[in-house]
Amino acid sequence: MRRKAVLLTVVLSLSGGSAQAMGLLDAWELALRNDAQLRAAGFERDAGQEEVAIGRAGLLPSLQYTYGANYSHSKVTQRDRTLNNTTKRDYDNYVSTLTLRQPLLDYAAWARYQQGVTRKLMADQRFRDRSQDLMVRLYQSWSEALLAQEKLMLLDAQRRAYQEQLALNRRLLAAGEGTQTDLRETEARYTVTEAQRIEQEDTLDAAMTDLENMMGSPLQIQDLSPLALDTLPDNVTENRSLSQWRELTVRHNAKLAVQRENVDYSRYEIERNRAGHLPTLDLVASTRNSLSESEYNYNQKYDTQTVGLQVRVPLYSGGAVSASMRQAAAEYQQSQAELDNQTRQTFAELRRQFNLCANGAAKIRAWQMSVAAAEEAIRATRQSVAGGERINLDVLMAEQEWYNARRELTEVKYRWLQAWLNLRYTAGTLNEQDMMQLAAWFQSAPVINKTGINAATGNKTN
């Protein structure tokens, strides 16, 4: 029922009229259904489920039926001392065989079965990784779009301020109180702002395109619920030390789990090749019907049932088995080295994200103070210009510092949320509850359709 309500809300928010911003959870629900990368991972997982059955088949009985029918024409000559007797034969013959084979001792088949189990587990872990990665990719594109929009708003405000400054410079120049230098400095700043605005428009378009691809629906920036996080919550690292997060990572990180299964797969590959030196033992049972199978049993019908054991002992294969074992052993060492490398990289990324989370609150407070100080600097600089103590360039630089501080404050909030998400993704514990917590830090206005009905509650709005 919750998913149906979410989808109804999303559909109404994407339709025309006065629909308001959708929430991050709504977007996630759509992405779960429509993201091509996740769907591909789902098919890969489904294919991986069959690896166990394929490997198990080598340990189970096999039943085979063969039938052959022919028409034969032969000439039989019998010699005695005085003459040759020739007889012509035209006849039908057939052979029908049903064979049951049950492996009793087949080390290669056992190794292939174990490899099938590891491949199935690898497919499961890859799908879990893609599911968690979808949350990360969705937030990344979501935050990039909102951040680009906020930067555009700041650039628009900055552009308006420069336009006002240009108008003031022109009035002062016309009155003989200004200079061409002041005018050109302001024009240069205004031109740079225009270029930065174009760059942010491109960034916004790219982020919105990524969101549309994930969600499978067209979007406008107005559809996205904005960030509503002024101060960071307490306990951002869940009272866990870095070493505790490392322990979680070893147990739950999907990429490490895939690599460990790959090591096991390589180990069983060694055993599979070792089987080339070992005998196999099969139980074989068959029933065979034949008529005139050859000239020696012409016009004779046989019904034969047999049960027995069949042993195959490899003696020599030109050195291929030994070479294959050496190759598999080298690949096993390679997989272990890749696991070590993946573990080190994962721990390094975990430390980076942990530090970003732990230091996020201090960074946000510092940039909030920087914004407040920049606002005071603008007011003081303008008063000094009016008193003749400062020049036009000082005002432009003070305004630039304020816009830079505002931009950094906005970016550090989004970066902290990204680190909060990445910390749990790297540890392998990222789940739906984390996504719900993340969505709670974004404002999500109720969706109002064209009839004035709140899509979430069903109540009439005034």
Curated annotation (Swiss-Prot):
Residues 1-23 form the signal peptide. One of its GO terms (molecular function) is porin activity. InterPro entries: Bacterial_OMF, OMP_efflux, T1SS_OMP_TolC. It holds the Pfam family OEP. Keywords: Cell outer membrane, Membrane, Signal, Transmembrane, Transmembrane beta strand, Transport. Gene3D superfamilies: Outer membrane efflux proteins (OEP). Transmembrane segments: none annotated. The keyword Transcription does not apply. GO terms for cellular component: cell outer membrane; efflux pump complex. It is found in: Cell outer membrane. The keyword Nucleotidyltransferase does not apply. Belongs to the outer membrane factor (OMF) (TC 1.B.17) family. Involved in the secretion of proteases A, B, C and G. This is Proteases secretion protein PrtF. It comes from Dickeya chrysanthemi. The lineage of its organism: Bacteria, Pseudomonadati, Pseudomonadota, Gammaproteobacteria, Enterobacterales. The gene is prtF.
